[in-house]
Amino acid sequence: VTKWNCQITKASEIPSVMAKAFYIARSGRPGPVLIDITKDAQFDTFDFSYEKCIGIRSYKPVPEIEPTAIAEAAEAINNAKKPFIIWGQGVVLGNAEQEFKDFVEKSGIPAAWTILGLSALPTAHPLNVGMVGMHGNYGPNMLTNECDLLIAIGMRFDDRVTGDLNTYAKQAKVIHFEIDPAEVNKNVKADIPVMGSCKDSLAVILSLIKNNTHGKWINRFDEYMKIELEKVIDKDLNPTKEGLTMGEAIMAINK
């Protein structure tokens, strides 16, 4: 699946099409483009001239921020008792790590990552509760179905994250911070879609949310982590067979 595709039939079209292709691929939500250059165009000759593409009239890579949506999202965040953040690669691609960290710390909301969002918040951060999805941690996966507000930031609700959509976070109101309109309501319905780059959106909403803590709610994640340590991690570190396990090797390296 590509963001855009084009067939070139004349060699003279190559510079303008390539400039357009790079602009589309790198702007907004980055993604692949396909350029099909016919054999005739490959063997043709022309006077080469290249001009960088800086915009396309029919293509708006970054939606404008809607103040109404930002205000509605801020109100929901301020009133939530058990809010939960899931962030993805959009935070990293949007260079929004600092804005995201400020948002998490001011709101006091526990946050979990999809595999491509990992680096946006240090894993040792007290509000980083682990990874979601089929390869993720026990607590974040279980408590997705217990939160009253699910805040998705720069992630697309992939099936490796959600599992069965028929039972995924049905109890929660969903806020979706997203740059690509095609991703909103595609897999999980967003009660409050917040369109725009997450860097800009988080910077704007930061002044509207309260300084908050969610101690009892965060304790639930700690409880599940203890269960995971006892039933999964400790078991892996203390095998009944001979030889080192992967878990033991990792622990030895960490020490």
Where are these regions (language model features)?
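Gly-rich Lys/Arg/Thr-decorated short loops/hinges at beta-loop-alpha junctions or inter-strand turns
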Residues: 1-3, 47-58, 120-124, 225-237
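Glycine-rich, acidic loop regions that bind phosphate or pyrophosphate groups
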Residues: 1-17, 39, 117-223
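Active-site glycine- and acidic-residue-rich loops that bind
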Residues: 14-16, 89-96, 242-244
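Conformationally flexible catalytic loops at phosphate/diphosphate-handling active centers
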Residues: 20, 24-79, 233
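Short, solvent-exposed amphipathic alpha-helical segments in soluble enzyme
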Residues: 22-24, 50-52, 96-108, 165-170, ...
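Anionic-ligand anchoring segments at beta-strand to alpha-helix junctions in alpha/beta enzyme folds, i.e.
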Residues: 65, 72-150, 252-255
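Active-site diphosphate/adenylate-binding microenvironment
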Residues: 225-255
